[in-house]
Amino acid sequence: GLSAIYAAESGANWALASLRQGPVENKERTISLDGREARVRISSVTKEGNTWKGKISSDGVDLQTKAMRFVKITFTVEDGGERKIMVESVASDR
């Protein structure tokens, strides 16, 4: 249901925000709130010069109904003084 969608999208937003503010590296986090959970991974990070590429996957679940939703994003981050995040592709699945 909607709770799983919100959880997955919230996890993806957390990952994008962490790319803007913190180091661009592989990381994993579980976020729980109000009966929803998002398992978020930033993976396959590669760096060439001032550019990083990688993948975000966020698996959202409604802990009561067990409904699940998956969001996958490929991204590029350029850091030439001001960090820019570009989303290359987005996929969402149940």
What are these regions (language model features)?
Residues G1-R94:
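Conserved functional hotspots that engage anionic ligands or polymers and/or phospholipid headgroups
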